[in-house]
Amino acid sequence: MPKSQKNENFLDKTFTILANIILRIVPMAPTEKKAFAYYRDGMSAQSEGEYAEALQNYYEAMRLEIDPYDRSYILYNIGLVHTSNGEHAKALEYYFQALERNPILPQALNNTALICHYRGEQAIQQGDPETAEVWFDQAAEYWKQAIMLAPGNYIEAQNWLKITGRFG
């Protein structure tokens, strides 16, 4: 049974049902349907922590998908998997690729900021406050962009920007 049919989570089940309906009723070329099915299965595997399987599905979806907007979400999800695996440099590559195709993807900007902030925290722990400030400044820039696109989101980031004097 495909991963997309094994979900026990209500939201995952709902997504799977809606995705299957979309695949049946929305007129799409067979290649687009296959790409969407791989994307759906990748999301399902990812939600279950099956990251290797998720990546396989996402890579196959990327091979088939031609629409830049849709590709941006696949790339974003590949970035999420790499973030979950602690592979921050790889994650950043995929977030940047997603943003090249879809510059108004606030979640990619937010995750990029989170990685920059994390690297700033690491620099502090290593006794390098100058490098930390560079990372924190980069995080601030990405968060400002994300907040501009989604003003009601990223409240913790907004607070951090205000507290550190980087909001302006």
Curated annotation (Swiss-Prot):
Keywords: Chloroplast, Membrane, Photosynthesis, Plastid, Repeat, Thylakoid, TPR repeat. It is a peripheral membrane protein. It is found in: Plastid, Chloroplast thylakoid membrane. TPR repeats lie at residues 35-68, 72-105, 120-153. GO terms for cellular component: chloroplast thylakoid membrane. InterPro entries: PSI_Ycf3_assembly, TPR-like_helical_dom_sf, TPR_rpt, Ycf3/AcsC/BcsC/TPR_MFPF. Pfam families: TPR_1 (PF00515). SMART domains: TPR (SM00028). GO terms for biological process: photosynthesis. Belongs to the Ycf3 family. Essential for the assembly of the photosystem I (PSI) complex. May act as a chaperone-like factor to guide the assembly of the PSI subunits. This is Photosystem I assembly protein Ycf3. The gene is ycf3.
